[in-house]
Amino acid sequence: MLKSNIEFKNGTPYICIDGVLHAPLAYTTYFEERGEYADFINSGYKMFFVNVSFTDLPINNTTGFTPFVSGVFETEVPDYAAFDATVRQILALCPDAFIFPRINVAMPRKWVAEHPYETVATPTGNRESMCSDLFRLDGAMLLQTLVEHIRSSDYAHRIAGYQLCGGTTQEWMHHDLFGSFSDMGLEKFRLYVQQKYGNEHPAVPTRADFKDGTNNETVSRYGAFCCETAATTVCHFAKKLKEYICNEQIVGVFYGYHAFVNDYLWGLHGMRFLIDSPYIDFFSSPCAYDCNRNFGVDWGDMFATASVKLHGKLCFIECDIRTHLTRRMQDARPGRYTDDFYGLYDAHGNKTVWCGPETAELSLSALRKAFAHQLVNGSGIWWFDMWGGWYHDDVLLADLAKMKTLARAAEEKNSSQYPSAETVVFVDEAAYLNNPRGSDFTHCVNRTRLAMGNTGIPFDIFMTEDADKVLHKYKAAIFTAPLPSESGKNAMVLCEKYNIPALLPDSAKAFFGTQELRDFLTENGVHCYNADGNVIYCGRGFVGIHAVRDGDVVISLPAKYKVKPLFGAAFADCETENIKLFMQKHHTAVFELL
């Protein structure tokens, strides 16, 4: 049985398997019959997430979509055939592959039907409630059964870790996207308030309270309850899984969108309750879907990745990057999906987030910009080829192979010797509860993160709870909550104490645009690499740029370095403090500093 853990080297987390460090780059697909396993194996990849679910009920309770043709526990006798076949297919091609089961903890139909009180209504039928103790109990038993099968199988010796998913879209969101609002949910909320605040007869909210701009104590407390409940559920299953695998391998969870999702009723603002869990080794979320993943902006992180690393965890980011080969889901699996959801174009003919670039050239740029962002931040990547066939192109695969090699080579670079972010952006997770649900103030985090991406100034994202540990490293701080929590207020006080210039939103000025952010930062001594609106990536001895228009660009380094082009540029290695090149609109270039 393989042993795995997260180990840091030169400030960057790696997956250590049987004492050997591995750069966290992996591949997965929802449609295994169209999986490009051979392509990625031939490109040097050895890590593979393999999806498996307790049920084939929808993962999206609005559209009714599920990628799962079968659920392990939907039959009288557990059916592991599809999962086993995929694992064996990969190992036949690459006997030394590392397999990571990606387990969807979702209760089968029979359980849902037999326990209506433990469920919550959704547009496509009832599903298990995050509040349900019975769900946690019975779900853990099913998880144990599945894991026992995996650990007793003929491929057990290649299992290197696990990822736990659940809730809506497998991202541990409440199935109803409304805080598991039900009779049982409200009863659990009453107990929560009684135990936490000593209130013998707590008021409970109505649905209308969350839709009319109300923000009273009861509403705010229910929002906190939603997030703590989701976090408790995630931690419960992670703890159980660690027990079942005798703490021998890493466990990750798909959770934590506090820098992207602004609705606390989804349950995703509970990272502060999980970040120190001894049962969770890595966190995953997609790179952000800002502007429908259009070019010209940074596809940033949905959670405070710098905080996750500070607490000894790996950020293993889903990069579901569409390409010129991305097809309609219905065409990729003919006859399976009759409704036209996840279409490539909307009713007005505009591209949706499901549509890829028109050309292989722009597809290369998309992969490069996603890779550059994660490379400089020391995060892992799993390329999510959702419907299969997205990367089946020799040009794309050549780049993906080079990325794998670079990620491995970067292990030896001492990141402290190279330029890094001088700006900290703070996410105040608890501050969402201070605002009416859906109000403009709740969008400030996402808008600020997006605007920062075009300042030409690198930045790190931390939770306000970590301010005392990290502020001394930065020249300036950006806050994102007009109505801060106590943690946010404490972080602001620390800025004053350490004489760190801080940009503070308030009710009169809740949001700052790109130019305002750039001006504030440069006026306070922060180095700007490019002031023309291009996206800049910098860290760990690498620099990248994503161009917003055609023309000559200059990347101004803070000192002179030997520069080696890696992607998107062709010139001899040279020593310079100004990288100059001509770039086409929406192309991406990446360089190594030596």
Locations of regions flagged by a protein language model:
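The substrate-binding groove and active-site-proximal loops of carbohydrate-active enzymes
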Residues: L21-Y30, N51-A81, A121-M141, H149, ...
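Polysaccharide-binding and catalytic clefts of secreted carbohydrate-active enzymes
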Residues: N104-A106, V112-D290, D298-W299, A304
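N-terminal carbohydrate-binding accessory modules
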Residues: M1-I41
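Aromatic-lined substrate-binding rim segments of carbohydrate-active enzymes
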Residues: R34-T122, T233-I245
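Acidic (Asp/Glu)-rich catalytic clusters
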Residues: Y37-G44, T86-D96, D154, R272-P278, ...
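Carbohydrate-binding surfaces of carbohydrate-active enzymes
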Residues: C235, E243, N247, D281-F283, ...
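Hydrophobic faces of well-ordered beta-strands that scaffold small-molecule active sites
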Residues: A23-Y27, F48-V50, I99-I103, A160-L164, ...
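Short, acidic/polar
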Residues: T29-N42, T145-H149, N262-D276, S363-F371, ...
